[in-house]
Amino acid sequence: MKKDYIIESEKTWDSIAKSFDKTRRKPWQECLDFIKEISEESVVVDVACGNGRHLIPCAKKCKNVIGLDISRKMLVIVKEKTIKENISNVFLIHSTAEDIPLKDSTIDAVLFIAALHNIYGKENRIKSLKEIKRILKNDSKAIISVWSRYTNKFRKSFQNKNLHSKKIEFGDKHIYWRKDGLDIPRFYHLYGKKEFIEDLEEAGFRKIKVKGVKIKSEKYNDNYFAVVTK
């Protein structure tokens, strides 16, 4: 039986899939740089692939790419794009990041972009990271990104940890999708750099390299990207 937070998350991302696709077309340069380093014979998994903005460039280079997402409607969008671009080496699976239906140590590289922070509960986030580690071959790498809590936009909400509600985790916040007439709350656990590294370490990754990226904030990082090794 699906947990309530998974059902809610699936509904949320199904509801905004078409609108999301309009505004998330450009791949992150950090991801393109990561893809450049992957062998053409690699089998790659894009966990929480969304609308495929990183999956498509990866598929154009690598042997096979598996895209997983909690949203069936996101997967439909990806499928339509692969057909349009005549890409035949992509395999799509409806799945959560916490329970990846792939065998141990079979994958050459993993992308997990802007999705870890959408998983409710620290235990579940760690579980998803451990799943990524499990499916990776030894010495293989993953790129993982999260939103930062200390941006110009969000930092005021988290300046005093003692004033934060004890009923929720420090960093938890609902951020609304308000485009195309929609007004839909999305769960986020916004990360600090230290916490991000600690979660990656707890999952068992090594050679953790974290980079902060600014988008709209002049002083503070908006995102953190980590390249990790199994």
Regions found by a protein language model. Name each.
Residues M1-S42, P57:
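Conserved class I S-adenosyl-L-methionine
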Residues I126-N138:
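A short glycine-rich, Lys/Arg-flanked "PGG" loop and its adjoining helix->strand segment in the class I
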Residues L111:
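A conserved beta-strand element that flanks and buttresses the S-adenosyl-L-methionine
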Residues V45, N51-D99:
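Class I SAM-dependent methyltransferase SAM/SAH-binding core
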Residues I143-D199:
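SAM-dependent methyltransferase
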Residues F205-K216:
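Conserved S-adenosyl-L-methionine
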Residues K216-K230:
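Core SAM-dependent methyltransferase catalytic element
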Residues A114-N118:
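Short catalytic micro-motifs in class I SAM-dependent methyltransferases
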